[in-house]
C-alpha cells in the first residue's frame, strides 16, 4: 500500500455503524439538471423515523452499506452518493411517506436500462428497516435520455410505413392462445385481417411449443397476411413473437421474420429482460422492423399500491429500452387501470414533454427531447360497446386490440373483425363531426348497427358484459 493511500484511508475513519441520515439525508440539497430523480413510497418499520428510512433508500441504492468502511476515504462520496432531499407524508395513509432521492448521473452506465434498475431497485427492496417500498416515478435527465436509441421507429414512422392515418389502429390477439396448430392459427390470422383489422397478434406465451413451433407459425402467418393484403389493398401485420430462451435465438427469429418481409415482430420485455429487449430494438431499427412489446409479468411488479414499481416507471424504461407499441391497460376492460393514472403514463409514452401533474401520478416533469414516442395498446376484455370510450380515452395514436371481442363473434372471426372496424369508423366519423363520444357513444354504435349486420350481432352478444371492479391503482 502506498503512503498516500494509507494516509487518505486512515484520516477521519472511525469503524462502526452510524445512522444513514447523517450522510444521506440532505434536505438542503438543490437538485441538478443531470440528476436522476426518484420518488419512493416508503413504509418504515415501527420505530424507524421517515428521515432514516428515506436516507437508507438513498444509501443502499447508491454508495452506502450497513457499516462504515475505510474505502470510503478512497473516493468522493459527496460526488457519487444518492441523496434523500425531501420527504412528505402520503395523504390518507398512516406511516407512509414519499421520499425523493437524487442520484448523480455518473452512477449509471450510458444506454443501459439494466444498469439503471440494478442500481436503483436492485437491492434496497429487501431492506429490513422498511416494511414496504414502491418506486412511484423517475425523472430521467435529458443528458441520460440522449444515450438511448429508444423506440426502433416511433409513431409517425409507423403510420408512414402502414399508410394509415387519422384513426386508432385495430388489432386482435389470436385465441385460444395455446393449442392451435400453425395452419389453423394462420387461418384465424387471415380471417381477422381480411375482415378489416390492421394487426393480429401472438399471445405473450406463444413462443415455440411442441404443438406449434415458431418457424411453422411464422410461415403460415406470413402467408395469411400477404393473402389478406392482396384482397383488401391495405398493409397488414402480425406480431410475430420473437421472445426466446436466449438472446441468440431471439435474434434468429427476428432475422427470419425480416427475411419473410413482415412489418413487425414482438417481444415480452419484462420476462425477456431489458438487455434482450434493447438488443432486439437495435436490430429492428437497423432492419426496418416495427417492435410490439407485451408487458407480461408487470402486475407481479406494479399492482400492489405500497410495494413494487409503478407501471409508469416500467413504461418510461420501455421507451428508453425500445419498443413501438406497449400494452397499457384499457380503463374500461377486464384489466387493472384507473383513468387518470393510465392517461398519465400514456402521455409519458407518446409525448415529447410532460409536465408534473400529481393528480395523474406524474411526480416529475419529463423531457424526452428527440426520443420517438410509443403507441399505447389497449387490450383485455374489450368489445364493440367499448369502442366509443376507447376512442375518446386513447385518441388516434393508439392500438385497440380485441381478442375475444373479435374471435368470439357468433358468426366467426372475419365478421368479428368487420364489426370492430365498422364500430371504429363510426366513432371516428362521429368524433370528427363534433359529437361527444362519452355521452353519445351507445347511440352512435346503435345507429351504425343499421348498416352492419356483423356489428348488430356483436352488440347483441356483448350487451350485458361489464367488468366493474374497483381499481387498486389509485392515487
Swiss-Prot record:
<keyword id="KW-0560">Oxidoreductase</keyword>
<feature type="binding site">
    <location>
        <position position="173"/>
    </location>
    <ligand>
        <name>substrate</name>
    </ligand>
</feature>
<keyword id="KW-0602">Photosynthesis</keyword>
<keyword id="KW-0150">Chloroplast</keyword>
<keyword id="KW-0601">Photorespiration</keyword>
<feature type="active site" description="Proton acceptor">
    <location>
        <position position="294"/>
    </location>
</feature>
<dbReference type="GO" id="GO:0019253">
    <property type="term" value="P:reductive pentose-phosphate cycle"/>
</dbReference>
<keyword id="KW-0479">Metal-binding</keyword>
<feature type="modified residue" description="N6-carboxylysine">
    <location>
        <position position="201"/>
    </location>
</feature>
<keyword id="KW-1015">Disulfide bond</keyword>
<keyword id="KW-0113">Calvin cycle</keyword>
<feature type="modified residue" description="N-acetylproline">
    <location>
        <position position="3"/>
    </location>
</feature>
<keyword id="KW-0488">Methylation</keyword>
<keyword id="KW-0007">Acetylation</keyword>
<feature type="modified residue" description="N6,N6,N6-trimethyllysine">
    <location>
        <position position="14"/>
    </location>
</feature>
<dbReference type="InterPro" id="IPR036422">
    <property type="entry name" value="RuBisCO_lsu_N_sf"/>
</dbReference>
<feature type="binding site">
    <location>
        <position position="295"/>
    </location>
    <ligand>
        <name>substrate</name>
    </ligand>
</feature>
<dbReference type="Pfam" id="PF00016">
    <property type="entry name" value="RuBisCO_large"/>
</dbReference>
<dbReference type="GO" id="GO:0009507">
    <property type="term" value="C:chloroplast"/>
</dbReference>
<comment type="subunit">
    <text>Heterohexadecamer of 8 large chains and 8 small chains; disulfide-linked. The disulfide link is formed within the large subunit homodimers.</text>
</comment>
<feature type="binding site">
    <location>
        <position position="177"/>
    </location>
    <ligand>
        <name>substrate</name>
    </ligand>
</feature>
<dbReference type="GO" id="GO:0004497">
    <property type="term" value="F:monooxygenase activity"/>
</dbReference>
<protein>
    <recommendedName>
        <fullName>Ribulose bisphosphate carboxylase large chain</fullName>
        <ecNumber>4.1.1.39</ecNumber>
    </recommendedName>
</protein>
<feature type="site" description="Transition state stabilizer">
    <location>
        <position position="334"/>
    </location>
</feature>
<feature type="propeptide">
    <location>
        <begin position="1"/>
        <end position="2"/>
    </location>
</feature>
<feature type="binding site" description="via carbamate group">
    <location>
        <position position="201"/>
    </location>
    <ligand>
        <name>Mg(2+)</name>
    </ligand>
</feature>
<feature type="binding site">
    <location>
        <position position="379"/>
    </location>
    <ligand>
        <name>substrate</name>
    </ligand>
</feature>
<dbReference type="GO" id="GO:0000287">
    <property type="term" value="F:magnesium ion binding"/>
</dbReference>
<comment type="function">
    <text>RuBisCO catalyzes two reactions: the carboxylation of D-ribulose 1,5-bisphosphate, the primary event in carbon dioxide fixation, as well as the oxidative fragmentation of the pentose substrate in the photorespiration process. Both reactions occur simultaneously and in competition at the same active site.</text>
</comment>
<feature type="binding site">
    <location>
        <position position="203"/>
    </location>
    <ligand>
        <name>Mg(2+)</name>
    </ligand>
</feature>
<keyword id="KW-0934">Plastid</keyword>
<dbReference type="GO" id="GO:0009853">
    <property type="term" value="P:photorespiration"/>
</dbReference>
<feature type="active site" description="Proton acceptor">
    <location>
        <position position="175"/>
    </location>
</feature>
<dbReference type="InterPro" id="IPR020888">
    <property type="entry name" value="RuBisCO_lsuI"/>
</dbReference>
<keyword id="KW-0460">Magnesium</keyword>
<dbReference type="InterPro" id="IPR036376">
    <property type="entry name" value="RuBisCO_lsu_C_sf"/>
</dbReference>
<dbReference type="GO" id="GO:0016984">
    <property type="term" value="F:ribulose-bisphosphate carboxylase activity"/>
</dbReference>
<comment type="similarity">
    <text>Belongs to the RuBisCO large chain family. Type I subfamily.</text>
</comment>
<dbReference type="InterPro" id="IPR033966">
    <property type="entry name" value="RuBisCO"/>
</dbReference>
<feature type="binding site">
    <location>
        <position position="327"/>
    </location>
    <ligand>
        <name>substrate</name>
    </ligand>
</feature>
<dbReference type="Pfam" id="PF02788">
    <property type="entry name" value="RuBisCO_large_N"/>
</dbReference>
<dbReference type="InterPro" id="IPR020878">
    <property type="entry name" value="RuBisCo_large_chain_AS"/>
</dbReference>
